[in-house]
Amino acid sequence: AQKLMEAYHITEAECVYASQTVKATKRESAWRTMLANTVASLYVCEALRDVLRGQMIFYGEPFDAFMAKEMYCYLSKTIDRMVKQNIRKRNTLKYKNQYRFGIACRLAFRIDELGQQVSWAPEREHKLLAVKKAAENEFGIIMRGELKTPLRDKAFTRGVADGGTVSLHRQATARNGYLEG
């Protein structure tokens, strides 16, 4: 195996880590970035954005990257559904995005609490550093930009309040879909 890896110039990180992509917008939104980074840290992955292709990439061990992608898709669809249910159509896009950002902030807090309760939490920091180093080797230097989000009090606080109602214990079944539990 070592000879084949040397012959084809493959590193061990390329064999251990995989990436999962999610279709995203080319324009960066604060709530999606916050949600992706939080979910990625829970599943020991690195969340990257490919602006040219409009993709969100979760990079880590194959199962962890898959779980991060699925959780991100579930939570982002849930947030969009909550916006349609709870916010009137005539409200502005800024108001809706602040509501989404409020939900994402509350979910980030809840996911961080959930991450502290897992049995492998002490080892997570070392794994995150290894994944980050492998992602930099794979994709190049990773730049993090500051997201500007002016808070509109009413929309943000409504989002934070409604973010507590989102279920984080969704279970996949063998049937044609998912059950919320």
Indicate residue ranges for each PLM-predicted region.
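Basic, Lys/Arg-rich alpha-helical nucleic-acid-recognition elements, primarily the DNA-binding modules
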Residues: 1-2
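Extended, helix-rich structural scaffolds rather than catalytic motifs
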Residues: 5-181
